[in-house]
Amino acid sequence: MENQAHNTMGTSPCEAELQELMEQIDIMVSNKKMDWERKMRALETRLDLRDQELANAQTCLDQKGQEVGLLRQKLDSLEKCNLAMTQNYEGQLQSLKAQFSKLTNNFEKLRLHQMKQNKVPRKELPHLKEEIPFELSNLNQKLEEFRAKSREWDKQEILYQTHLISLDAQQKLLSEKCNQFQKQAQSYQTQLNGKKQCLEDSSSEIPRLICDPDPNCEINERDEFIIEKLKSAVNEIALSRNKLQDENQKLLQELKMYQRQCQAMEAGLSEVKSELQSRDDLLRIIEMERLQLHRELLKIGECQNAQGNKTRLESSYLPSIKEPERKIKELFSVMQDQPNHEKELNKIRSQLQQVEEYHNSEQERMRNEISDLTEELHQKEITIATVTKKAALLEKQLKMELEIKEKMLAKQKVSDMKYKAVRTENTHLKGMMGDLDPGEYMSMDFTNREQSRHTSINKLQYENERLRNDLAKLHVNGKSTWTNQNTYEETGRYAYQSQIKVEQNEERLSHDCEPNRSTMPPLPPSTFQAKEMTSPLVSDDDVFPLSPPDMSFPASLAAQHFLLEEEKRAKELEKLLNTHIDELQRHTEFTLNKYSKLKQNRHI
């Protein structure tokens, strides 16, 4: 009865402790699941935001590519128009040169003819009066043709002015785009500063988490949480670095595009200058054409005078002189308008000089901005390199700490197994002591019984001392990872008390058996040896008994059944935790592969 009560008293605190441990484990697992779910949601939201940012950046790039294509088309069209204009002007120049050469020859002939006519007397004036209207009509037609040409040139001048206005508008748009890019660069700098602050916060949280132990959670779970946090921080740093590199490349490409556009604008300005020079040349050519018209008039008069007789030439000499004088007056009036054209040309030249000065100042400003951006890029690369080095050092330190903790866990598991083996031995020894009746106990060989008892007691003492030493070492080192260390000490004390009670029972039995030694004959030692062979003692390597106990001891059976159920639950919990950890690792690998593919697509 005393042994049964002692067994019930021994199993009840163990059951309570195990139930408390199971409840704590369930609470910890539920808390861990909630934390993981929150982290996964936060990661999903971040991924969605990053995807949206990538889509926005892609749309911006597409828009900029379309703008570049439109600008290229405009440049091609302008080049084609300029080529066509130059070809037309060259053809007109060649035709005007040919006409000028003809007019010079005719003028020389007219001059010689007039010199001859001055020597000859004037006669037959009425015949020439009939031919004068015909000559005047021809001259009027030629004047109208030249006026039409002057109108066309005026229209071309208006077109060139509109083209200059459009170029000014394009320059304004380019300046606005440069300002927008500066604002974007400032926003990127603010984002970088925010990320640096986040990194500093994470770096300050890491030693705090390492130094402050949480009594409600296990050390392995805390270490896994810290490792996952560091991995996420390293991934965010790598992603931010790649983003910054891509954005810097985009900015450099856009700056190159703007430099090309500036060069194209310079080429357009040079073309406008050449067009203005060609316009000056055209004005000069117009003046030459007017002179040529005058010479043609003189030539026509020579031809008509040559066809007629000398008398008719003498009579028509006076009116033919009056008409060229009138034409000369008209030409002088046209020459008076020439200073106005020169003033307009001077104004256009001054405007072009102002545009060139403004363009040069903008180029210098853009160069200064490019140099500033390059310096900022170098500084950012240096900071990123330092952050990566710090992250690598932290990863190494965490790996070393994890290895040390895994070794300590392995040692502690071995000590737990040994403690369980000793506890099962103690329970089976109690069962054996209760199973032996006083009559049978007196009939056994006393010497064999004492030897087996002493060997079992010595073994239990040795195992208990070894377990105590292991627990003392773990307590001194201060690196235990389980929160229920006090339970091990209590179980050790309980085992020691049970051992003392077993010794007291054996001493009492020995005192009872001493007066009956002389009366009872010694029996052969086969009975006790058979009993020893069937006894459920546990070896040093096994955790559970080799043979089940007798049905007459329900307390030992209940304890064994309870231990088996607890082991099954522990194994199931381990399996669940391992499966959950594997799922998390697969998910992280999937996300990493996804982002690596996105990075590769960006680089392509």
From Swiss-Prot:
InterPro entries registered for this protein in UniProt: Cep63/Deup1_N (IPR031470)
GO biological process terms, semicolon-separated: cell projection organization; centriole replication; de novo centriole assembly involved in multi-ciliated epithelial cell differentiation; multi-ciliated epithelial cell differentiation
Phosphoserine found at: 547
Compartments, record wording: Cytoplasm
GO molecular function, one term: identical protein binding
Entry GO terms, CC: centriole; cytoplasm; deuterosome
Keyword Cytoplasm: yes
Coiled-coil segments: 14-59, 85-197, 226-278, 336-399, 558-601
Pfam families, alphabetized: CEP63
Keywords assigned by UniProt, alphabetized: Cilium biogenesis/degradation, Coiled coil, Cytoplasm, Phosphoprotein
Family note: Belongs to the CEP63 family.
Assembly: Interacts with CEP152; the interaction is mutually exclusive with CEP63.
Miscellaneous notes: CEP63 and DEUP1 paralogs are both involved in centriole amplification: while CEP63 mediates mother-centriole-dependent centriole duplication, DEUP1 mediates de novo centriole amplification in multiciliated cells.
Function statement: Key structural component of the deuterosome, a structure that promotes de novo centriole amplification in multiciliated cells. Deuterosome-mediated centriole amplification occurs in terminally differentiated multiciliated cells and can generate more than 100 centrioles. Probably sufficient for the specification and formation of the deuterosome inner core. Interacts with CEP152 and recruits PLK4 to activate centriole biogenesis.
Protein name stated in the entry: Deuterosome assembly protein 1
Organism: Homo sapiens
